[in-house]
């Protein structure tokens, strides 16, 4: 689990947006960056600054994954055929912790990683405790039977804050989620605008 878990909503203020679209975010009340004069900062941002912010925002959205892991994901996306920006989104969305979050089995990406680490999730009938594990289309994720009545699971399933995307098919009775296909950027229900093309520019420049 990320060391930033206890301060995850400070990330919203750091990047200047409520990136998870949650009502609990302090950014809803103080919509400026941290610091005494945060609300007064209106400096023009350079191209590099915009690219850096795009990278930080996307990296933070997926549970503030480490720079090393995020850069490795970019390198993999750049080596794949097709558009590197779209490839990057596809790789991030195919992470097990992302799919558990999309399926609404947990309330946050941070909770998804912890939930997986604690052995509450199976993939294709086998327990998996690696949040960064990569899923393939057709893979089935299931919450273990003994974990289905945990408070955070019930909270997430009943939350109106998020919709389940079309590329994840959920059976709420069996507590399964089938990863149907690799999504395009336009398919992903980000609460804020993500700019993976800027991320590509950051790493390739």
Curated annotation (Swiss-Prot):
UniProt KW keywords: Ribonucleoprotein, Ribosomal protein, RNA-binding, rRNA-binding
Subunit and interaction comment: Part of the 30S ribosomal subunit. Contacts protein S5. The interaction surface between S4 and S5 is involved in control of translational fidelity.
Entry's Gene Ontology BP terms: ribosomal small subunit biogenesis; translation
InterPro entries: Ribosomal_uS4 (IPR022801), Ribosomal_uS4_bac-type (IPR005709), Ribosomal_uS4_CS (IPR018079), Ribosomal_uS4_N (IPR001912), S4_RNA-bd (IPR002942), S4_RNA-bd_sf (IPR036986)
Family: Belongs to the universal ribosomal protein uS4 family.
Domain S4 RNA-binding: 94-157
Source organism: Hyphomonas neptunium (strain ATCC 15444)
Keyword Ribonucleoprotein: yes
CDD domains in the record: S4
Protein name: Small ribosomal subunit protein uS4
Top-rank taxon: Bacteria
GO molecular function: rRNA binding; structural constituent of ribosome
């Amino acid at each position: 689990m990320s060391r930033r878990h206890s301060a995850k909503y400070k990330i919203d203020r750091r990047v200047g947006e409520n990136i998870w679209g949650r009502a609990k975010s302090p950014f809803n009340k103080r919509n400026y960056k941290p610091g005494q004069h945060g609300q007064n900062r209106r400096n023009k941002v350079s191209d590099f600054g915009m690219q850096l912010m795009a990278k930080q925002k996307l990296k933070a959205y997926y549970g503030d994954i480490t720079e090393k892991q995020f850069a490795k994901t970019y390198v993999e996306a750049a080596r794949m055929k097709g558009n590197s920006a779209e490839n990057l989104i596809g790789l991030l969305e195919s992470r097990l912790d992302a799919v558990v979050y999309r399926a609404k089995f947990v309330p946050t990406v941070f909770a998804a990683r912890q939930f997986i680490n604690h052995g509450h999730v199976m993939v294709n009938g086998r327990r998996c405790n690696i949040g960064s594990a990569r899923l393939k289309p057709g893979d089935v994720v299931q919450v273990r039977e003994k974990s289905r009545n945990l408070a955070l699971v019930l909270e997430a399933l009943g939350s109106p804050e998020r919709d389940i995307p079309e590329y994840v098919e959920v059976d709420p009775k069996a507590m399964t989620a089938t990863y149907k296909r690799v999504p395009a950027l336009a398919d992903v229900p980000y609460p804020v605008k993500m700019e993976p093309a800027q991320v590509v520019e950051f790493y390739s420049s």
